[in-house]
């Protein structure tokens, strides 16, 4: 006889306050506009809406094709600050707040590193940087799009927590978390220790491998 499960919806609450998010335990991982096509972005986001789970934007920012899908979205912020950057590549609070406060954006994920290329940045080659991608990311069309290996906004755990608090405030108190791969366990330990000492925490942590 199958066991009785009190809650078969398999969801967990992330964040606190009115903008906390009741998140499914199964979601769509980061899939950038630019890495995959507009129809693929919209189809995945529509699936998120139908299935009542979330779709992570990947580092390519929130595009009109995500919005067309209408599904719950996790906006990933990478070292390139795509969608929330100034012309010189620095983080822009005003541009961030404009997108982060959209109803469809449920959580913010700061990408520190990823398992596919731990410790490295990335590049979208110039031929792939179309007008739409350039407008979405806030970059120049037809030029190589560079994701630096590290963030300008922080370089240690204390600065990271300060940045998390900043994004939380700018987004209207939406959940803000981090994504990283565990190249060296002490890196995560130092972040956790800093949170414990400060009594200030990220809302979630995405672990992307242990490379």
Say what each PLM segment does.
Residues 1-49, 53-56, 61-70, 76-116, ...:
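Conserved, well-structured core domains of diverse proteins
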Residues 46, 67-69, 89-211:
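Alpha/beta enzyme core
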């Amino acid at each position: 006889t199958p066991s009785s499960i009190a809650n078969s919806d398999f969801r967990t609450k992330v964040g606190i306050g009115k903008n906390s998010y009741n998140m499914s335990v199964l979601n769509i991982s980061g899939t950038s506009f630019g890495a995959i096509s507009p129809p693929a972005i919209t189809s995945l986001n529509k699936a998120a809406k139908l299935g009542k789970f979330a779709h992570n934007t990947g580092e390519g920012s929130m595009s009109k094709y995500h919005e067309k899908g209408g599904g719950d979205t996790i906006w990933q912020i990478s070292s390139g600050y795509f969608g929330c950057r100034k012309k010189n590549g620095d983080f822009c609070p005003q541009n961030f707040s404009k997108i982060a406060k959209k109803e469809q954006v449920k959580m913010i994920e700061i990408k520190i590193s990823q398992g596919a290329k731990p410790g490295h940045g990335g590049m979208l080659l110039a031929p792939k940087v179309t007008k739409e991608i350039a407008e979405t990311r806030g970059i120049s069309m037809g030029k190589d799009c560079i994701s630096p290996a590290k963030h300008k906004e922080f370089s240690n755990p204390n600065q990271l927590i300060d940045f998390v608090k900043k994004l939380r405030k700018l987004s209207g108190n939406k959940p803000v978390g981090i994504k990283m791969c565990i190249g060296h366990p002490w890196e995560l330990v130092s972040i956790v220790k800093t949170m414990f000492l400060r009594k200030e925490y990220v809302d979630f942590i995405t672990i992307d491998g242990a490379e």
